[in-house]
């Protein structure tokens, strides 16, 4: 299950559908792809691609069908099924800048590699009118998902990481962000044949972190953790654990099924037992918080 992720500014690292089974892609954002949005699969693939956002960026070839591609189903993994595709439920996805495909995802957004005269017949065999069974998830409409993902994705706790801030800003503005001296930091091994121009950083595709200003330097004051179990002394003392006993990190103080260190990491009060098997209790436990304790 791929849910509420951001896939941004790459040429070959977006989702590739595996063979023989389900593939669920819900409420994600794919931005600034070059030759791949989603592709792959085989005759046994069962795809749910629901309420996502596909936003072309500076590197996306707007003069090609790739620019409004949601998914490219593939076949031919086995000789006896070389022309047999899997099944797909594709619905509710927004392709930014393309009203036609947004209105009907099957009007150009699903692109099996067949000739035009076989396209209608092939799509009819692939298309499903109802989604396949998949893990429980609250599905947002695509517009709401776009805003939700951009405000929640990445390293946001206790504040947004500088790298993720740059990526999110690029998605919002639709523009590549790079350093003034980016041209000085080209790095591609001589053994690698380039597929893009040397200045592809101007379109969001970098080959060296220094092309976008380098990696940020993080500073902070470590909290006291006497037993080194990953849980601060103050948190352990607050909830009746032993700051001198590292073994209590993997214990379960309230029997809810999560280790104590998992409770700490997820901001859960270990004195309150919650039935996490009840789906209505499942939520983002860090939502709205600025610190763990």
Annotate each PLM feature.
Residues 239-250:
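Extracellular-facing binding/remodeling surfaces
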Residues 221-229, 248-256:
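Acidic, divalent-cation-chelating loop motifs in proteins
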Residues 42, 47-61, 66, 74, ...:
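A conserved active-site cap/scaffold subdomain adjacent to cofactor or substrate pockets
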Residues 7-8, 234-241:
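Glycine-rich, acidic and aromatic/proline-enriched surface loops and short helix-turn segments
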Residues 11-19, 34-40, 58-66, 99-104, ...:
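Short glycine/acidic-rich loop motifs that flank beta-strands on beta-rich extracellular proteins
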Residues 90-91, 95-226, 232, 239, ...:
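C-terminal functional modules
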Residues 1-14, 21-35, 46-58, 89-97:
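Right-handed parallel beta-helix
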């Amino acid at each position: 299950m791929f849910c509420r992720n951001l896939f941004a500014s790459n040429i070959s690292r977006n989702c590739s559908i595996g063979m023989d089974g389900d593939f669920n892609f819900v409420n994600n954002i794919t931005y600034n792809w070059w030759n791949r949005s989603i592709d792959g699969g085989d005759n046994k693939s069962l795809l749910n691609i629901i309420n996502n956002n596909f936003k072309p960026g500076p590197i996306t070839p707007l003069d090609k069908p790739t620019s409004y591609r949601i998914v490219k189903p593939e076949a031919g993994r086995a000789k006896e099924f070389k022309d047999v595709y899997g099944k797909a439920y594709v619905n509710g996805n927004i392709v930014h800048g393309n009203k036609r495909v947004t209105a009907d995802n099957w009007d150009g957004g699903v692109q099996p590699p067949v000739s035009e005269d076989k396209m209608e017949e092939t799509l009819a065999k692939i298309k499903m009118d109802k989604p396949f069974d998949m893990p429980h998830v609250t599905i947002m409409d695509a517009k709401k998902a776009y805003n939700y993902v951009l405000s929640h994705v990445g390293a946001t706790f206790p504040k947004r990481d500088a790298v993720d801030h740059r990526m999110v800003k690029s998605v919002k503005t639709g523009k590549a962000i790079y350093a003034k001296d980016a041209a000085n930091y080209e790095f591609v091994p001589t053994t690698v044949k380039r597929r893009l121009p040397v200045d592809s950083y101007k379109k969001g595709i970098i080959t060296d972190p220094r092309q976008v200003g380098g990696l940020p330097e993080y500073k902070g004051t470590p909290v006291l953790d006497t037993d080194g179990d990953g849980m601060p002394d103050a948190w352990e003392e607050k909830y009746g654990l032993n700051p001198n006993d590292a073994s209590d990190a993997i214990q379960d103080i309230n029997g809810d099924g999560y280790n104590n260190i998992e409770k700490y990491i997820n901001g859960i009060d270990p004195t309150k037992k919650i039935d996490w098997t009840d789906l209505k209790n499942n939520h983002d436990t860090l939502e709205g918080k600025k610190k763990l304790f």
